[in-house]
Amino acid sequence: MHNVNILTIHKEPNYGAVLQAYALYKTIENLGHVPYIINLDMDYSRFPYSLKYRVLLGLHKWMKGYSHCFALAERFSRKHCPNQIGNFHTTAELESYPWNKDDYYLIGSDQVWNLGITQNLRTAFCFSFLKNDVKNRYAYAASFGNIKDEERRKSELDMKALSLFKRIAVREKFGVEFLQRNGIDAVEVI
């Protein structure tokens, strides 16, 4: 039995994000391991538009509903994925946590490498905050989303950290090809 620390997008106002996190958590648990969600709070995504933009477009009513959806997602996550580590907001906070080098670390299964979603936390989703002696790094059904700009991906993702993964499975064929062109072995999963 191993501790499996999962870094994913798990409490966004999006049923797909919430349910994929729950499904992965339960699958790890059903395989006889102890899952933990790394609780990385992506604050910026709660208010993706400037106040001026929201007011001009009348989005203030929309934002009330949006905030309610966040609360529901967080409540679901706490109830159905109770093992959660920390309340991190930055890569620096993740770096200062005493991660166990013998645990397993799993990224996925969502658009964790979509630069438009992960924004200032994009390197965290490559496990850049783990020390090099952590050997059990995996990615399952990680997605680049629709970001097909290879130069942007190469410059903004932590390719060195990705090269330390034992196994990587991604959703897109272009993602497999991108990783392989950069010396990182990957397979496609659906």
Task: Name each region found by the language model.
Residues 165-172:
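A short beta-strand/loop micro-motif in the catalytic core of glycosyltransferases
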Residues 176-190:
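Helix-loop-beta element that forms the nucleotide-linked donor phosphate-binding surface
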Residues 4-15, 19-160:
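Aromatic- and Gly/Pro-rich donor/ligand-binding loops
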Residues 9, 40, 173-174, 184:
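An acidic- and aromatic-residue-enriched active-site/binding cleft used to recognize and process polar
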Residues 22, 172-173:
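Alpha-helix N-cap/helix-start capping motif
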